[in-house]
């Protein structure tokens, strides 16, 4: 097994060319999804003149087990996945996009990955938009975040109950991100299916409109 299973996968780009972009929206697909799929979710929410970047997971899955499994069970896939998010951020930075004009979004497994990356690499981003996800790690295990999100807008939205993401983890993630300086909004949708709704997209668009 390679130590970097996602390392050879590409990053798909649409929207404004990076050198001309006013900002960048990085989108992370869920288990079984593709970069092309998640870019379709980004199109209704990305501001004009923004670029969109979507890394592709090997085998269409960022890590093999639940985000609530012991972290070691999801290695080396999890570390490799976080590396692909880093690569997308670095692409934007190298093109001259400031970090506070880089937003990171994802759905389900991709939302967990987005939340984990931002929580472990805090700085002022344009936004974190996590549709049905939360910080990664088993229930009951301590999660400690350090650093400063410096007022980064954070939108965490999910159904309750959800078959994969307990609401308690969404709330815990919101609390922890707020403790390190995130400006957190949570949206709880009783009975919502495991999907992204139009209302969630409108909320995300509102966040990015002022990014």
Predicted regions and their residues:
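Short alpha-helix in the alpha/beta-hydrolase fold that links the catalytic acid
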Residues: 38-41, 141-142, 166-176
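Short beta-strand/loop motif that positions the catalytic acidic residue
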Residues: 155-158, 162
């Amino acid at each position: 097994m390679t130590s970097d299973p996602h390392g050879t996968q590409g990053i798909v780009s649409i929207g404004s060319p990076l050198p001309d972009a006013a900002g960048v929206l990085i989108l992370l697909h869920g288990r079984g999804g593709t970069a092309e799929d998640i870019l379709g979710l980004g199109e209704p929410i990305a501001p004009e003149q923004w670029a969109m970047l979507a890394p592709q997971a090997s085998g269409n899955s960022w890590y093999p087990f639940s985000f609530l499994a012991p972290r070691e069970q999801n290695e080396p896939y999890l570390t490799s996945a976080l590396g692909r998010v880093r690569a997308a951020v670095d692409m934007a930075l190298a093109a001259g996009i400031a970090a506070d004009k880089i937003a990171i979004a994802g759905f389900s497994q991709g939302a967990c990955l987005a939340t984990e990356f931002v929580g472990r690499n805090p700085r002022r981003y344009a936004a974190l938009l996590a549709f049905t996800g939360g910080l990664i790690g088993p229930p009951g295990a301590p999660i400690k975040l350090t650093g400063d999100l410096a007022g980064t807008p954070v939108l965490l939205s999910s159904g309750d109950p959800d078959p994969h993401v307990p609401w308690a983890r969404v709330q815990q993630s919101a609390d922890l991100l707020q403790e390190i300086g995130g400006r957190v909004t949570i949206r709880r949708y009783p009975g919502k299916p495991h999907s992204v709704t139009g209302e969630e997209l409108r909320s995300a668009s509102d966040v990015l409109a002022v990014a």
